[in-house]
Amino acid sequence: MRIVVALGGNALLRRGEPMTADNQRENVRIAAEQIAKVAPGNELVIAHGNGPQVGLLALQGAAYDKVSPYPLDVLGAETEGMIGYMIEQEMGNLLPFEVPFATILTQVEVDGKDPAFQNPTKPIGPVYSREEAERLAAEKGWSIAPDGDKFRRVVPSPRPKRIFEIRPVKWLLEKGTIVICAGGGGIPTMYDEAGKKLSGVEAVIDKDLCSSLLAQELVADILIIATDVDAAYVDWGKPTQKAIAQAHPDELERLGFAAGSMGPKVQAAIEFARATGKDAVIGSLADIVAITEGKAGTRVSTRKAGIEYR
């Protein structure tokens, strides 16, 4: 079975946790313990978020004023290497030594006319109090938005159109390699058709939407969107909340989910299920084996109408 696992940012750094290398490695180790359970006998691709990490690099760059800050596409590439290295090493420590791994720097095409460039929505970096956020917005010209009871910097998040490195990813999978790619939604890139040239863009692509595109282009058998809850819920946080066990994309789309949290995950699952006729599942990383067996998570499928709740 060809599996694409999209790791949420919380799998790499928990909310409010200091962004140290040791903390990130420990979280990667915990995630690797779960993902390694589904590696034997399957073709495995791992995508991951990078919001906290790319924000931290931006802050570190801004602190050294003798060099102009690096653009977001370059910072995204840096995080792909850093996080991919940690995942490779921690997964490799759990699986037989001869199992090959590869991290692919992944350029992802976006449209320069995407309206997202005029409406920044993607949170990056650490969380701030209202006072801190307002001060930083004034000092640095950032766009700031609420994130729960805190605030974060937000940047443009255009839709992914095409993954340029999809052929090398396929070649590696066919040779039995576990591939880490499309980290942080990939490196946002524009393609000049006339000049046949690529150029980076100041943006961060949504990891879940890019993972959905990746799974579609790889013709994956299942897309697993791993998060810190066991399913997608209706009425989340209310006494009436209910976990969704299974849903047809059309029915799920009518419910509406928060744009900054579950919304992109649900949309990514819907797009994959519609495009391929295969299942996408939103659930907890701790349940990954049960998810592959159809026993856990919210399964988005075109094969059955309606919605079922737990």
Swiss-Prot record:
EC number: 2.7.2.2
Localisation per UniProt entry: Cytoplasm
One Pfam family it belongs to: AA_kinase
Keyword tRNA-binding on entry: no
Biological-process GO terms, alphabetical: arginine deiminase pathway
pH dependence: Optimum pH is 7.0.
InterPro entries xref list: AceGlu_kinase-like_sf, Asp/Glu/Uridylate_kinase, Carb_kinase
Substrates-to-products reaction catalysed: hydrogencarbonate + NH4(+) + ATP = carbamoyl phosphate + ADP + H2O + H(+)
Activity regulation, free text: Inhibited by ATP.
CDD domains, alphabetized: AAK_CK (cd04235)
Induction line: Induced to high levels by anaerobiosis, induced to moderate levels by arginine and repressed by ammonia.
GO CC term, one of those recorded: cytosol
GO molecular function, one term: carbamate kinase activity
Gene3D superfamilies hit by this protein: Acetylglutamate kinase-like
UniProt subunit comment: Homodimer.
Function of the molecule: Kinase that plays an important role in arginine catabolism. Catalyzes the phosphorylation of ADP by carbamoyl phosphate. Shows weak activity with acetylphosphate.
Assigned protein family: Belongs to the carbamate kinase family.
UniProt xrefs under NCBIfam families: arcC (TIGR00746), PRK12354.1 (NF009008)
Protein name in UniProt: Carbamate kinase
Organism this protein belongs to: Pseudomonas aeruginosa (strain ATCC 15692 / DSM 22644 / CIP 104116 / JCM 14847 / LMG 12228 / 1C / PRS 101 / PAO1)
